[in-house]
Amino acid sequence: MINHENNPDYLNSFLDYTVTILNKSPNTIKEYNYDLATFLKFIKVHFKMTDEEDFSKITIKDIPLSTIKQIKLDDIHAFLSYLTNTYHSKAATRARKASSIRVFFNYLSQKANLIEFNPAQNLETPK
């Protein structure tokens, strides 16, 4: 079950879009939420917005859209590298997270028009 109260509004809007317009399954929505929450927690640490390093204690509700607008492809690569180095994530796991990030940024830039630049546009799928 997704607790929408823990998410920033733009993430909840994306999840609503995937349910209503893309007709994704509840499982897919849950995975998108998990993947993107993990990514946003990483961004919060990476951008030095928190001193907390325990991801289970990091909140994402307060990450403003202005921070999302600052994310570059290098930051996404840093996240995928973090998954490899910290969690020894396999390529399939990283590929799913990359896909979630790609769909999220496509929504923000092309559908919701909340950001001008899509940093995931040239993101390749990990192999």
Where do the PLM segments sit?
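N-terminal core-binding DNA-recognition domain of tyrosine recombinases/integrases
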Residues: 12-27, 37-127
